């Protein structure tokens, strides 16, 4: 005995519902894993950024004033960005990943509903086969045939009722699925938009702090560090003393031209000879 048109329709509906449930289970599972991985990578990026902030602060402490100030301010802004990234991670986890995870339990319930429906279908098919056998074995026994027909009718009614319930359940499931997937992706986009909006604001401030670094001033500080003030003062004193000492030690004759110095020596010799002549004259008298 072949299936009735109603039974065939119910079977087709059940197969379609089963395929729909399998499809949701497969793709929601994949989406859940991918979104969870996205959140983990975002959290790791936050951790790496924290390390960057720490290193920038450590390096800034060794640098010249405006470079230090600029790097410190950059690090503060970048640390603020990581606070927003942490909020992004928490929101993605609670508003995207968790709702997808919850579909694991929902799918399990739908599979239970499918099992109940399939069991009802099997009972209907079994009663139909039993009625066919009864008619073949006892074609004249109306009582047994009537009893088998009653059992089949009861099984058919149960199968129809359960199929109707399953159809309503799956209809609600499909409606909720569409609503949830729409909300889920809207939440994802909103969370990312909020984060990137804040990121643009913070990174703009960080960029400005870097641009405010005065290269010339820092270079001048570095150059001055090569010649400490006390060393420069001592050097200036030594140079000044050297100049003044050379001036005070120079004899007056040094300033005379060589010709004058020779003339003076000749005059001194002539004066000495005149003195000797005068002494000799006095002795003769």
Curated annotation (Swiss-Prot):
This is CBY1-interacting BAR domain-containing protein 1-B. Transmembrane segments: none annotated. Residues 142-184 form a coiled coil. Its main location: cytoplasm. Residues 11-221 are annotated as: BAR-like. Residues 241-261 have a biased composition (Polar residues). Gene3D superfamilies: Arfaptin homology (AH) domain/BAR domain. GO terms for cellular component: centriole; ciliary basal body; ciliary base; ciliary transition zone; cilium; cytoplasm; mitochondrial inner membrane; nucleus. Residues 1-48 form a transit peptide. Keywords: Cell projection, Cilium, Cilium biogenesis/degradation, Coiled coil, Cytoplasm, Cytoskeleton, Differentiation, Flagellum, Membrane, Mitochondrion, Mitochondrion inner membrane, Nucleus, Spermatogenesis, Transit peptide. GO terms for biological process: cilium assembly; inner mitochondrial membrane organization; positive regulation of smoothened signaling pathway; spermatogenesis. Residues 267-285 have a biased composition (Acidic residues). The BAR-like domain displays limited similarity to other BAR domains. It is found in: Cytoplasm; Cytoplasm, Cytoskeleton, Microtubule organizing center, Centrosome, Centriole; Cell projection, Cilium; Nucleus. It is a peripheral membrane protein. The gene is cibar1-b. InterPro entries: AH/BAR_dom_sf, BAR_CBAR1/2, CBAR/FAM92. Plays a critical role in regulating mitochondrial ultrastructure and function by maintaining the integrity of mitochondrial morphology, particularly the organization of cristae. Plays a crucial role in ciliogenesis. Plays a key role in the correct positioning of the annulus, a septin-based ring structure in the sperm flagellum, serving both as a physical barrier and a membrane diffusion barrier that separates the midpiece (MP) from the principal piece (PP). It holds the Pfam family FAM92. Belongs to the CIBAR family. Residues 241-285 are annotated as: Disordered.
């Amino acid at each position: 005995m072949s299936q009735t048109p109603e039974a065939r329709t119910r079977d087709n509906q059940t197969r379609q519902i089963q395929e729909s449930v399998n499809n949701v289970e497969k793709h929601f599972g994949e989406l859940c894993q991918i979104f969870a991985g996205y959140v983990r990578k975002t959290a790791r990026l936050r951790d790496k950024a924290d390390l960057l902030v720490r290193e920038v602060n450590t390096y800034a402490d060794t640098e010249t004033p405006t470079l230090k100030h600029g790097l410190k301010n950059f690090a503060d802004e970048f640390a603020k960005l990581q606070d927003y990234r942490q909020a992004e991670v928490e929101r993605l986890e609670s508003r995207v990943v968790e709702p997808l995870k919850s579909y694991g339990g929902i799918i399990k319930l739908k599979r239970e509903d499918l099992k109940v429906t399939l069991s009802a279908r099997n009972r209907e098919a079994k009663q139909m086969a039993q009625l066919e056998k009864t008619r073949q074995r006892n074609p004249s026994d109306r009582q047994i045939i009537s009893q088998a027909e009653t059992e089949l009718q009861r099984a058919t009614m149960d199968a129809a009722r359960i199929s109707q319930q399953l159809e309503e359940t799956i209809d609600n499931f499909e409606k909720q699925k569409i609503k949830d997937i729409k909300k889920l992706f809207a939440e994802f986009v909103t969370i990312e938009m909020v984060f990137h909006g804040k990121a643009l604001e913070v990174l703009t401030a960080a960029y400005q702090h870097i641009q405010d670094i005065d290269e010339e001033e820092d270079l001048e500080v570095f150059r001055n560090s090569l010649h400490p003030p006390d060393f420069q003062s001592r050097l200036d004193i030594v140079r000044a003393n050297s100049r003044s000492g050379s001036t005070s030690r120079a004899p007056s004759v040094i300033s005379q031209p060589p010709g004058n110095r020779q003339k003076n020596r000749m005059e001194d010799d002539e004066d000495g000879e005149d003195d000797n002549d005068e002494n000799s004259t006095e002795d003769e008298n």
